Design a protein with these regions (language model features):
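Conserved ABC ATPase "signature" region
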Residues: 16-28, 80-99, 208-209
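A short, surface-exposed alpha-helical micro-motif characterized by mixed small hydrophobic
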Residues: 171-173
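A short, proline-enriched helix->beta-strand linker immediately N-terminal to the Walker B motif
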Residues: 123-127
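Short, glycine/charged-rich "phosphate-handling" switch motifs in NTP-dependent
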Residues: 177, 189
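ABC ATPase NBD coupling module
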Residues: 24-46, 64, 72, 194-199
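Charged, flexible cofactor/metal-binding loops and thiol motifs
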Residues: 26, 192-236
Length: 236
């Protein structure tokens, strides 16, 4: 969607990604030029990645990394961006914002780094937030806190959230509508109630069967094994 794969050898071979941009109107992101994409990334579409330690730059302070998008997209001065950065750190419930803004990523815990990523992603109040497995690397207590923050900010800022996850427990908490993907293709779509109460595709049922249930010790058969790579008859 954000065309980040362009920089790692990826290529979009067919299809469209239609987006209603506040600045450029309706456009197809697959054919948008670099200037248009640069104005949209981080401004109208933002992303929270799975592992914040590899997403944050280790040689810049937390405050500088949040302020960067505010200066670039919002036209703020350095002083204005600093003030807004501190407000964002408070909004994601990080204490001692002044000290944290001058800290480097390695000095923060995993949960704190992910809160910084949320603050950075929502700094320009995007219309779409893509959350790619944002809680997978966190323990369940921190996971619940992060999900609650995303939900509250989504409501307060009126931001649409595309949540990518394999955890159906998270889907039940966060989603209104669900699209189930299998082997890169959409196999089922519906409201969260339809998916959970009347799943149609075997893969959807397998995902739901993987959710732990209190008092249940009965195992479920594994889904059909899918090869990752086939090389001259050898399956990996």
């Amino acid at each position: 969607i954000m065309r980040l794969t362009d920089y790692s050898g990826g290529d979009i071979v067919n299809g469209q990604v239609l987006f209603q941009s506040a600045s450029s109107g309706a456009l197809d992101l697959t054919t948008a030029n670099d200037d248009t994409l640069r104005s949209i990334r981080g401004n109208e579409i933002a992303m929270i990645f799975q592992e914040p330690m590899t997403s944050l730059n280790p040689v810049f302070t937390i405050g500088n990394q949040i302020a960067e998008s505010l200066i670039l997209h919002q036209g703020m001065t350095v002083a204005q961006a600093r003030t807004q950065t501190l407000a964002l750190l408070h909004k994601v419930r990080l204490p001692d914002a002044e000290r944290l803004a001058d800290s480097y990523p390695h000095s923060l815990s995993g949960g704190m780094r992910q809160r910084v990523m949320i603050a950075m992603a929502l700094s320009c109040q995007p219309s779409l937030l893509i959350a790619d497995e944002p809680t997978t690397a966190l323990d369940v207590t921190i996971q619940a806190q992060i999900l609650n923050i995303i939900r509250e900010l989504q409501r307060d800022l009126n931001t649409a959230v595309m949540f990518i996850t394999h955890d159906m427990g998270v889907v039940a908490q966060m989603a209104d509508d669900v699209v189930v993907m299998w082997r890169g293709r959409q196999v089922e779509q519906g409201t969260v109630e339809q998916i959970f109460h009347n799943p149609q595709h075997p893969y959807t049922r397998a995902l739901l069967a993987a959710v732990p249930r209190l008092g249940s010790m009965q195992g479920q058969p594994l889904p059909k094994r899918t090869p990752l790579i086939v090389l001259e008859g050898d399956t990996l």
